């Protein structure tokens, strides 16, 4: 189980990765000359160096002199970076980006970035050379991660597993002993029908047992259970209360799926996309609902940079709420009399001139930092949890547009 400190560290690392990814997505090459390499943690660095050497040799066949030179320079730069690593890359692997990016007016500049230990392990080695950097696998790692239990069943077979983020993990399966329907009448048919119902009931109990064994130990972490199969079967299963009552309470959707083998788990996830999207937003909605309740019902809420900063410094903030769309820097100023003040500006803008509100003197900039990293640093020191809030719903938009993308739920009222 991760500690609060680990969670904060992970949030910070994810945000730092997200910033780099946004930067990389803006870059364009004038041709297929931007190189991306994904290296899993179990891939020997020497193997990667050999692969790069081979690619460098093959790049000599590129007809365009400029593209040929740029690709080979990018490969050389990546090869130089790999000299700093031992036999294997760091935990979770490493992703390297290098290439000549366009700066306008026909000019280019060489950019090289290395991202060590991404949020999840790199799954496989990938070499990519194109007009843009390959960031999709990293973006998938940074996507909201839910944990959902999956059940697909008909009267012949069943499979249960997990949906972890975007990854489906089949875990258990079962085949039934339910016989086909009897066509003839008479007492033997009635007896057969009774035995068949008993076999169906036994199979449903077996499936529920698999699901209960897998999901109940994770009941405090699970975001929901999805059930799929033909209409009569899944409805009978759910209506029969076979699942543990704590699982029955978190069934968030049932869906018609044609297959009930392992591929049926993937079909179930595809069918549940709308429900899964709603579940991701629901957590953010709950945070914002609590924020507005605190805001309207008393003084245990704060918003805006300066009030939130002051409350953070006091250790009064339980949860720091930051908009996912916040893209600003904080500039710290100090006047000749030692008064310190802060100004939040668009990160694309230059430092504005600042006059001290206390003494009216011109102030000098002493620091400029990403506002999210600045606030998260204080939050980490004060044991405050940080939550990133989506703008895909009304109150999430309000946080960004009306409250400057910064708010907090307080542990106690401070009057600030």
Swiss-Prot record:
Task: State one molecular function term (GO).
Answer: translation release factor activity, codon specific
Pfam families named in the record: eRF1_1 (PF03463), eRF1_2 (PF03464), eRF1_3 (PF03465)
- InterPro entries to which the protein is assigned, alphabetical: eFR1_2_sf, eRF1_1_Pelota, eRF1_1_sf, eRF1_2, eRF1_3, Peptide_chain-rel_aRF1, Peptide_chain-rel_eRF1/aRF1, Ribosomal_eL30-like_sf
Supply the NCBIfam families for this chain.
aRF1_eRF1 (TIGR03676)
What HAMAP family has UniProt attached to this entry?
A: Rel_fact_arch_1 (MF_00424)
Self-association state and partner proteins as the record states: Heterodimer of two subunits, one of which binds GTP.
Q: What is this protein called?
A: Peptide chain release factor subunit 1
Q: Which organism is it from?
A: Haloquadratum walsbyi (strain DSM 16790 / HBSQ001)
């Amino acid at each position: 189980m991760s500690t609060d400190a680990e969670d904060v560290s992970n949030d910070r690392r994810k945000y730092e990765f997200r910033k780099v990814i946004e930067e990389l997505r803006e870059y364009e090459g004038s041709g297929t000359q931007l190189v991306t390499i994904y290296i899993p943690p179990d891939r020997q660095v020497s193997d990667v160096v050999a692969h790069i050497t081979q690619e460098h040799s093959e790049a000599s066949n590129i007809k365009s002199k400029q593209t040929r030179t740029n690709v080979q320079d990018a490969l050389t730069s990546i090869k130089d970076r790999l000299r700093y690593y031992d036999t294997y890359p760091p935990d979770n692997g490493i992703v390297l980006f290098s290439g000549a990016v366009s700066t306008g007016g026909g000019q280019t500049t060489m950019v090289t970035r290395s991202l060590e230990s991404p949020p999840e392990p790199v799954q496989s080695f990938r070499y990519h050379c194109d007009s843009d950097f390959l960031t999709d696998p990293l973006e998938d790692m940074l996507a909201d991660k839910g944990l959902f239990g999956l059940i697909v069943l008909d009267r012949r077979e069943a499979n249960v597993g997990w949906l972890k983020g975007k990854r489906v993990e089949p875990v258990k399966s079962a085949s039934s002993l339910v016989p086909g329907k009897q066509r003839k009448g008479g007492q033997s048919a009635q007896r057969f029908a009774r035995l068949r119902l008993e076999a169906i009931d036994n199979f449903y109990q077996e499936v529920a047992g698999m699901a209960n064994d897998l999901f109940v130990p994770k009941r405090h972490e699970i975001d929901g259970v999805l059930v799929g199969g033909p209409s009569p079967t899944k409805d009978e299963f759910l209506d029969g209360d076979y699942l543990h009552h704590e699982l029955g309470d978190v069934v968030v959707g049932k869906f018609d799926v044609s297959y009930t083998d392992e591929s049926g788990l993937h079909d179930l996830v595809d069918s549940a996309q709308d429900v899964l999207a709603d579940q991701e937003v629901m957590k953010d909605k709950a945070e914002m609902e609590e924020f507005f309740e605190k805001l309207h019902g008393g003084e245990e809420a704060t918003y805006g940079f300066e009030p939130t900063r002051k409350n953070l410094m006091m250790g009064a903030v339980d949860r720091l709420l930051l908009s996912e769309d916040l893209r600003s820097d904080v500039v710290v100023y100090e006047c000749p009399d030692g008064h310190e003040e802060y100004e939040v500006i668009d990160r694309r803008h230059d430092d504005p001139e600042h006059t001290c509100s206390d003494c009216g003197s011109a102030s000098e900039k002493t620091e400029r930092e990403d506002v999210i990293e600045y606030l998260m640093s204080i939050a980490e020191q004060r044991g405050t949890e940080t939550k990133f809030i989506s703008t895909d719903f009304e109150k999430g938009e309000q946080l960004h547009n009306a409250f400057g993308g910064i708010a907090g739920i307080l542990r106690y009222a401070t009057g600030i």
